[in-house]
Amino acid sequence: MTSLPSPSARTCRDYHHPYDPYDIQLQFMDALYETLQNGYKIGMFESPTGTGKTLSIICSSMTWLRDYKRNYNLNTKLLEGNVSNNDDKQAGEDHEGTKGKDDDDDDDDDDDDDDDDDDDDDEPEWVKMAYQKSIVDKSKNKLKDFERHLNEVDQAYKRRVQKNKEANLGTKIRNVARKQQTQEDPEESFLPNDYNETNQESFINDVESRNLQLSTEIERLMKSSIINNNGSGSNAVDDAAAAAAAAATDDECPTKIFFTSRTHSQLNQFSSQLRLTKFDASFKDLEERTKYLPLGSRKQLCINDKVKNRKGEQSINDACIDLQKTKKGCTYLPNPSNSSTISSATKEFADLSLAQIRDIEDLGDLGSSLHTCPYYSVREGIKLAEVISLPYQLLLQSGSRDALKLDIKNSIIIIDEAHNIFDTLTSLYSVKITAAQLSRTIKALKIYMTKFLKKLNSGNRINLMKLTKLCKLLMDFLQSDLAKSAKLGDQVVGEEIFQGSTGDLVNIHKMEAYLNKSKIAFKLQSYMEKIGVEDVGTDFKLNSSSPILFDIVKFLKCLSYPKKEGKFFWDRIYGDNGGCEVSLNYMLLDPCAVFKEIVDQAKCVILCGGTMEPTSDFTDYLFPSIKHNKIKKFACGHIIPKNNLKVIPVGQYYGNFDFLYNRRNDLDQFKRLGEFLIKICEIVPAGIVVFISSYQLLSDIVKIWRETTIYSRLNLLKQVFEESVENTKLTSLLSEYSYVINTQCKGAILLAVVGGKMSEGINFSDNLARAVIMVGMPYPNAFSGEIVAKRNFIEEQVITKGGTIQQARAKSYEYYDNLCMKAVNQSIGRSIRHAKDYAIIILLDYRYQTPKVQGKLSKWVRDRIANNTTANTFDPFLETKKFFSFPIRSTK
């Protein structure tokens, strides 16, 4: 990452930060603004947790966008006006020239053109200035009218809500709708859509086309509403304002900011931070709100109880589409037979969604209030939005962008928590199946066919039998001798799966078309839930959000259209009971092909995070084709004073701390670790969080401590808490841990696992973590199928490009090493949350004392490593005492 600019080199630009920004926030905002302004294609920004990163992103990017729009309005609009004026003039000249024109007039026409050009050049300056002002004023007045229109709609809505609240009408309407929705469906609703194989081509993209058709219908109804609006009704606006709103849709700025993050809470935080800000308008002497839209999936935005309460996102999607095809349809969606009422609500929703900064929950409440679907209606505001937030999957999948009609060309893409981007891309395009899963599916299919066989048309009967046969062949393959003897990570060629069977007679492409058209996965799941046999017996933890058939469908799609950047390979799935089962995996191994489409279309892609190191993975595997001079790297320090954090690498305590995999059963080292922690607990106040590389290692260590006096001695000093693999216990564990720290003088110690919920989703501020201790280096299992397959792929790529075997192995090891260091940075970055916070970080392993490992720590951590930690005279306990004896440390 690049070094920080000197104070004298920074700009004095006003970023409209709602508070007095810290120096590092100004550095961050300067760097991001310059990245956008100077034509960089990629920006990589690291800002530690607790440094106000989100506000810095908002203020710098929105300041740039308003500056850009202001310049766009002054220059581009003027250019468009000149072109339009010249076109009109030329059209008039061409019309005149056609009267009595003959070949002898050609030279005269050329002379006339020259004369016209001279006339344009000779126009007085005041005429040119007046013309320029008229062009700019036209756009300014459009914006002013639209802002006034949004104000009027917002105020009218608030008055109506208050009136309805007083009359208690809203609840009555919603209860009636909910009662209608929860009525029991007849058995016919579980039947798959009729299927005729001769028409299968038209059904391949059925879901996507239906989404696009519905969006088009909403858009048509909105336009119709604007044209026919007669000013009546409780939410009426005058014709001039409606016309201004319609005109504004053709006058949007071509550049938008797309902000994406991994979790719902992070996106809501973005909304709340955006509410704090206010920026200069795109025109002088004008008030302009920030026009913001949060986009989400049906799971987040659906307000139909019958649909949104289904299990799994894909099941919700299919239920929505299925409901639209019924005679009554969905009560919240446009109905052509009642277009005036529905389009009015849809249009009002689109306006209200832009009138204020709202989060996803606000849009759900707004849709319920207006009795219109938020998922579809919110799209109608996209054209005029300046800032759009959305979860990773909606941005990273081209099909999702198409369904939402998202045009990311020339836009600013900001990816927050970017260290998650690799895992997200991989999971979106990867799937695994097991024999137990297939057995479960076959059993469910037999139950389903026994019930509905006589009601199925021939196309469904034939294809369900083929699907059952296909699942049986896949199950046999997973139980074959080949599968049992295969090494983890070994590649599987698609043709091998059906070799020696009649499976090759089943056309996978046609089967995929059938699955898309019939919605059998959704129908099957619905019926299984109704009769109460969803779980037909497996101890292995598969994706519970994709029950019964959905993962099988995804796997068959990968089998039908495998990406060249992905591969099939063998792996294992381990159950809670200690057993394991063979799995057949498909995994996207090269994410750059998927990401390239986004990079190519966007004006600039900004990757932000609290822990971006090591950064080489981004440049090597996410955008390798981007030249280094088009990549801006920035890393800032922390807002805390330098003496509020100390980092101590510890390589030995009565022997080396060496937590290599081959020493995972070193009982002596486990005991020395316990004795070290006891001495630390005697010094550190309040809470201590200890990160250990795996649940198994944590269990082994605690077992040894309990067999000796270590655990009881540790518990006397600080109450011991252990992270459980069960997520259901997380909330109660944290609550009890916090309660003990806040009510008992001795404090507590939390034994957590790297990669668990504690290491990624929880921030340990203030007394919750006065010390964070990392035990060993958390390398992932080198022999897992996914790691083996990924490293093999990297080595193949290096050799294909002319590299040696040694270079290939070095490159794949660097990837493996970086996985470990990312986990380290992510875990130890949870302790500092604000400017007055303080903590000590202890890294227990001799490898943390090496320059190579320290070079991959986050910059703000690296800068605070204690001096001379490898010297024989270095005493980590003395350093810890010094840290907490500093006056500020004596109180919270």
From Swiss-Prot:
Where ATP is bound, by residue?
S47, P48, T49, G50, T51, G52, K53, T54
Which CDD domains does the protein's record reference?
SF2_C_XPD (cd18788)
Entry's cofactor comment: Binds 1 [4Fe-4S] cluster.
- Annotated EC: 5.6.2.3
Record region (Disordered): 80-126
Per its UniProt record, what Pfam families does this chain match?
Answer: DEAD_2 (PF06733), Helicase_C_2 (PF13307)
Instruction: Check the record and name the SUPFAM superfamilies matching this protein.
Output: P-loop containing nucleoside triphosphate hydrolases (SSF52540)
Q: Where is the composition biased (Acidic residues)?
A: 103-124
Q: What role does it play?
A: ATP-dependent DNA helicase important for chromosome transmission and normal cell cycle progression in G(2)/M. May have a role in changing DNA topology to allow the loading of proteins involved in maintaining sister chromatid cohesion in the vicinity of the centromeres. Has a specific role in chromosome segregation during meiosis II.
Q: What is this protein called?
A: ATP-dependent DNA helicase CHL1
* Lineage of the species this protein comes from: Eukaryota, Fungi, Dikarya, Ascomycota, Saccharomycotina
Q: Which gene encodes it?
A: CHL1
